[in-house]
Amino acid sequence: MARKARLKAGDAIFHIMCKSITEVDLFRDCADKNKYLSLLKKYKIIYNVKIYGYCLMDNHAHLLIYANGADISKVMHGINFSYAMYFNKKYKRHGPLFKDRFKSLIVDNDNYLRTVSLYIHNNPTDIGEFKDCPEEYAFSSLGIYIGKRKDAFGVVDYDFVMSLFGNNLKKARQSYCSCILGCTDEKWKEEIEFEDETTDYKSERKILLRNFKSDDIIQFIASKMGISKILLHMKHNRKLVKSRALVVVLMRSLCNFKSSDICSILGNITQARTSKLCTIGVDLIISEKKYENIIGEFIENYS
């Protein structure tokens, strides 16, 4: 029987659930969960999506993601494929890790968004020691939402969801905590089912179109790095690695290009090298302050 095509609306918010195969825990230790969070950060940068919330349990993960013009299937493939490669190498295993495709539903109104966010953050109450204090669970974004913990990986964009609980952040956090403690898991399960749904829900979000020109990206990076744009097509020059890496990240993020497309544009480069440059570029954006808003700067200049 053919699989049902997944709805991939670029302007949608998705509640995503990833589950491991029956006999294997998705996360065996804290290091595994930290690795998954680092991959969320990486692919958030590459695809310019917004992650509204997450909760990583031992055998499954819940994510709340605004696609912002990206193809959600590509986003999740990047995250889960990279994690499966890491997991299989670490534990010297072969074969699939995830159970089928990820499950997803489209969040089609503000009330439903509130409910889904609360449902995700309520998951740790299934663990005995966190039954009455889910905010203490380190691998849920709840602690970040209510100001109890800093976002160590810089993953979560909680402002939009919190605005649905009030304009004053302090009061919104109090309201959020009250909702978490006052609602039963059974009630949420009645409202949340993983089915693809059509929607025209847009709220006040602006979608990022992925139709920027590669020539503009090359010119922008060349100007920012103080080099000739011709040099960005040169393969063997270690001094240009940072520049080429940033070009690759921006093309992946803003042009909806595949690795093969970027290979053709830069010339004389393999897909494996393109992937490596992308990783280098993401690391630069995360680790060096002067590059942390480089994607935003480009969008501001060329929109």
Task: Give the positions of each predicted feature.
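Short Pro-Cys-Gly-centered "Cys-loop" motif that presents a nucleophilic cysteine in a tight turn
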Residues: 1-53, 57-58, 66-303
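Conserved G/P- and acidic residue-centered "switch" motifs that form tight phosphate/ATP-binding loops
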Residues: 62
